[in-house]
Amino acid sequence: MGPEFEDSIPLVHSDNRTTTIYSVYIIISDIFSFVQWLLFKVLNLIIIDSPAFVLRLLSKNFEINLHLSSILATLIGVSVVTYLVIRYKFLTGYSHSNDQKEGAGKKGIHPASSKVFVGKSKQDKKPSNYLDEFLLAIKVFGYLDKAVFHELTKSMTTQKLSHEEILCLDESLGFSIVVEGVAQVYTKKSKENSSKYKQRYFEEIEEERDEFLILGDKQYQLLNEVKSGAPLSSLFSTLDLFRPRNKNEEMALTPNDEDGNSVVALNMDYLSKSEPATDSKLSNSDDDENGQDYPEIIVRPKKSHNNGTITIAIIPHTAFERVQSKYPKATSHIVTMVLTRLYKVTMSTVQNYLGLTSEILKSEIKLNEENATSLPRYFVDGLLERLNKKEEAEAEAENLPKKLKHHHRNQLQRTTSRYVSLDSKVKSNHPGDLLSSVPISRSEFQKKVLPKSSTTSLSDGDNKRMNFTDEMEETEENSLRVAIIENIFKMVGIEETNGIVERTGYFQSLSSSTSSSIVGLDSLNQSIMSGATTPTTKRSHPVFNNQGSLMNTINLAELRKPSTAENSTLPKLSGKKRLLSDMNIKDAFAKSLEIKYIGPDSTIVSQNSAITGLYYVIDGSLEIYNRSADVSAPNRYIYTVESGGIAGYLTSVVGFRSMVTIKTPKKTGAVVAYIPKNDYNKLLDKYYFLQLPVALKLKNLLSKQILTIDYALEWCHIPAGEVLCSQGDLANGFHVVLSGRFRVVRSTNKNTEKEDVEVLGEYGHGESIGEVEVLTASRRSNTLIAVRDSETARIPRSLFEMLSNENPSIMVSVSRLVASKVLASQYQPRERNFITSTTSQESFTSANYKTITILPTVSGLPVRQFAEKLVQALRQIGRNVIALDQASILTHLGRHAFDESLARLKLSGYFAYLEEEYETIVYICDTPVQSNWTSTCISQGDCILLLADAEDDSTTIGEYEQLLVKLKTTARTDLCLLHQDKVVRAGSTSPWLKNRIWVQGHHHIQMKFEQGANVLPHKKSFISDLAAKLSQNKAIKSTFEATKQHIKWYVKENDQSKVLKIYKDDFMRLARILSNEAVGLVLGGGGSRGISHVGVVTSLERHGIPVDIIGGTSIGSFVGGLYAKEYNIVSIYAMAKKFSKRISSVWRMLFDLTYPVTSYITGYEFNRGIWKVFGFAEIEDFWIKYFCNSANITNSTMDIHEKGYAWRFIRASMSLAGLLPPIAFNGCMLLDGGYLDNLPVNEMKKRGVKHIIAVDVGSVDDRTPMNYGDTLSGFWVLLNRWNPFSSHPNIPTMMDIQMRLTYVSSVNALEEAKRTPGVYYLRPPIDPYATLDFGKFDEIYKVGLKYADDLFADWKSKGKFPRIAGLVEKKKDGEEKKILYRRNSI
């Protein structure tokens, strides 16, 4: 490349740069020139061309010719278009806000979840091995500790029976439990009932029927079928198993194998020798002619289960003896469980259901006949003398002389009886011993008479108070108290098992238990102890097929070794220590003793009273009376407790309510010694080793029939959500609800893919279930699901039939119970009518909740304040109620009430006791969400009240609700929205209910409270920000404060009636609804005649009658909706009059006319009239619970509306066919509900309302007889109408016949409503008024007001006024008095 070319390169680059710059310059200059030209043109157009165009236009002449008709047509067209735009675009805004699915009842928890529960099988959670079955059965002992449980199970043996074997149940050998298969338990019938079977032999066993079994010449009847996991032995049999046995008893239990040639002879020989020394549980031996004793109870496998075999686990009696020695506290727990089952299951069922109270009372009669022990005469004389002197002193002070009547006195002098010296004190004394009761100086006695041979002494820690009143001399009164306690001890059986008590005390001191007292009242302890430690040989029992043993071999020698070693080191307690321990116990009991005189014809204890105790009769007598379940029945005399006897024994020992009334004779009084039941229970808890002998004594006193019932009854524990019995199951028994609640569910459409579940109702405490199916031998018609943890007493069908044969009165009482249920069901709402009612799922009867839980949605809500107001309201309506919170439970049961298993058992027992004592229990959830008490409250509630702040804009799910959902409770849950004022913002309720499918209902409650810090603040808005800025202006602020003060003064002056409106209290309303004491108001349809409803409602307020639930039809739905929304008669009157004026306007109706294809009018003016009153308010926003009905002509059903826009469904309920078009909703056409039920009393009754005030304003049904032949001429009908002298009534027209046809079902429903119990039927005299006479508002209103005022005044004068809870206070004697409210006079 040459140098010339290289020099030319910079020149080329310079030319290119110059060309580019020039091009840019040209473009910019062109743009600038275009802008100048455009600007010039615009200015030219504005300044020159436009004015010139205007001048040319104005210089021309225009001429427009319009005819008058054209002008009018144009104006009419514009007016019509404007009207249509405004009418259908702007004035129908209320109709466009109905996109949500209104009126569709929420499904809630119970219908949806019940289906899931119905699908559960009771065998789903069936244990799969022996240990699980055993654990399930051992729960009857009450959550034993692991050490005690291991002590019982380590000696357990099992035995398997084939279908050809029969087991002779010997409860003295041990405690038996079925761990596999189903066992049939038979009991021997009496000789009289089985005499016709004497010619049959043992081999002739009837296999055609399982109810009876022939064994030799004895007949056995089926008592019960015991399934796997259930105990085969009676819980009462454990009492005998705890008692140590001597050598003779052990040898008596050993069978003799010598006579092994004959199977029957071997078995009979065994049976004759295997009878325990004590009375067996069902022992009532029936000897035949050969002297052979047949067993009272036999067991055989059920052939249709587990291939006809069963496996039984047996805990030998030695295991129980070791538990009693090592763990005496556990023994007392088991005894407590035995007594708990006795009073909760057996006695409760026998008294309240079977009506065998006399059988229970026989034990107390037997006690007084066999064991009554009177005091020495000098004790009684001295006591009467002191009481006489006391009465004389009181009479002199009050100037009212009184004298006690008493018997002749013994001539013994007090000084003589006071200082008698007895050497017999050295010997062991017995309660009731006359000589041992003589008062002497105790200090001298301790120095002289204690034996010197005592070699073992107690430790310093165990050596407590050794005398009665420290070192003070014992007075005669103290001696009297000790003598009384000794007699009571003897009667209740404490002296009979001193060996057990003494050994219990020793091991108790080793384990450092709560008490180290040792009772030694008998010198037989050493022989009992020696007998208990004697080893025994193995036992083997022959069976019927001679191929195996009746029970597995139990090596008693090996089982006795630990006990023998322990007992060998047991130091013998000296007589001194035994006596001192005896004094300590007597000391404690004597201190709680009250001695008093009761005058003639005085009632000491009333029947069913829980405040009772032990009454020892010192002088005089007490009469015992009993009254049947009928309150009007008189008291029936039972027996008399003479001097030395005890009254109130069963009530104190078992803990049951008093089954009798205890009175003194009409002419003479009585001197009694009284130990309150609470003090008695506390002392037995302290000296818990006394519980076993007391329970053994009670067992020996009970009759065979009661023990048989106790054996066969089942104590069923059903966890929450589990199925008690399923639809279609065999009815092999019926249940009595002891505690808890059950929901009745019925499944329909089983053959279809979608199975419907219908909730029929609920069963609560004390109600019985399933008698009809048992009596008719049919299958279960319903499924029962436990709402919460529940307990029932199951009465097997076989037991019921056996008792009915022996006591026909049982069948009579149960038949009456079933008949009363059938009779009551006639007045209950029909489940299925010929017209299906699509009732909301939340409207089933929620009768009488036993337990109510108050649970907040979030922390910071006034739970305690709400609970206090609710409890006060419940008490005011006459309920016996108690409120429980965590503090009260911890105070009663200790700080470990929710931690330990045994403590939880006590907790459940305490809750069950409270359910017996109180009508309503309120659980207050005042603890954090993680607390055990919160979970306990949720699980214990029959009804859960969920508190929420209605003014809180945040409607999210709170932490307490999350726990509620997590626990999967099936209890009814109601949302309580708390308002500061009695105002509900339209549409503010539905957001709370929208996402809470577990809520079945809601209540609006006014309660002033301060919002907690945890409650979320309200959302900010533009208006609030503007108000905040304006409040900074001083002038505006001062004006605002002045106006606010004026408004407060005005409200105060014009709201003086609040004090008188106690009947409007929201907590009283809530209390009545929860207690089945609600008052319902049902307003019927009738067009303008329904204006009288306003007058009736005004009269209700004047007379202070509360209204808790409102229902209505047609015009009744309108007036009822107004009252439910406003709850203020002034507002109702004004709005009803406004609506009537609008509807009665002729011009409005004329403008609403349309071509009468479906209806005469479009319904626009009618809709606007209703909407002007209710606006966008929803039924959920109404302050009072409300519902209305409509006729669904698409599905041919009656629809009940409880949610959705109020105006829409009230309009549907008022849609008269022909006049108004039907309301279209979800594709269905809704018409006036009066066509199906013009007075929906039946629907109100389904909501559990007790008092229903039904106001009927419908037209009178014309029932004039017609007789015009088989043919009818229309001309004759026309002439008959025109003929004033015709004797024939006017024949109805086609329109009249069609109208009557549509109201056929409504007329029948009205007649049924009049006959419904609890309905107060009102019909004002409004017949002269037509259906559309809305222009006569004031006249019709006054007719209704005057009628209601006169009727209510007449009711009050004649005593027919409804006894509404809260308005009438119940006295103790059953009388009632009207509650007067204080006037606001200042």
From Swiss-Prot:
Q: Motif DGA/G in this chain: where?
A: 1232-1234
Please write the reaction equations for the catalytic activity of this protein. Answer: a 1-acyl-sn-glycero-3-phosphocholine + H2O = sn-glycerol 3-phosphocholine + a fatty acid + H(+)
Activity regulation reads: Inhibited by organophosphorus esters.
Entry keyword set: Endoplasmic reticulum, Hydrolase, Lipid degradation, Lipid metabolism, Membrane, Repeat, Transmembrane, Transmembrane helix
What does this gene product do? Intracellular phospholipase B that catalyzes the double deacylation of phosphatidylcholine (PC) to glycerophosphocholine (GroPCho). Plays an important role in membrane lipid homeostasis. Responsible for the rapid PC turnover in response to inositol, elevated temperatures, or when choline is present in the growth medium.
User: What is the membrane topology here?
Assistant: Multi-pass membrane protein
Identify the stretch(es) annotated as Disordered. 394-416
User: On the Cytoplasmic side, which residues?
Assistant: 1-19, 87-1386
Active site (record annotation): 1114, 1232
Protein name, as recorded:
Lysophospholipase NTE1
Q: Where in the cell is it found?
A: Endoplasmic reticulum membrane
As for family, the record states: Belongs to the NTE family.
Sorted alphabetically, which PANTHER family does this protein's record hold?
Answer: NEUROPATHY TARGET ESTERASE SWS, NEUROPATHY TARGET ESTERASE/SWISS CHEESE D.MELANOGASTER
Q: Pinpoint the PNPLA domain residues.
A: 1081-1245
Binding of a nucleoside 3',5'-cyclic phosphate 2: at which residues? 697-821
SMART domains found in the cross-reference section: cNMP (SM00100)
Motif GXSXG in this chain: where? 1112-1116
GO biological process, alphabetically ordered = glycerolipid metabolic process; lipid catabolic process
Q: Which SUPFAM superfamilies match?
A: cAMP-binding domain-like, FabD/lysophospholipase-like
Enzyme Commission code(s) on record: 3.1.1.5
Q: Which stretches face the Lumenal side?
A: 41-65
Compositional bias, Basic residues, is annotated for: 402-411
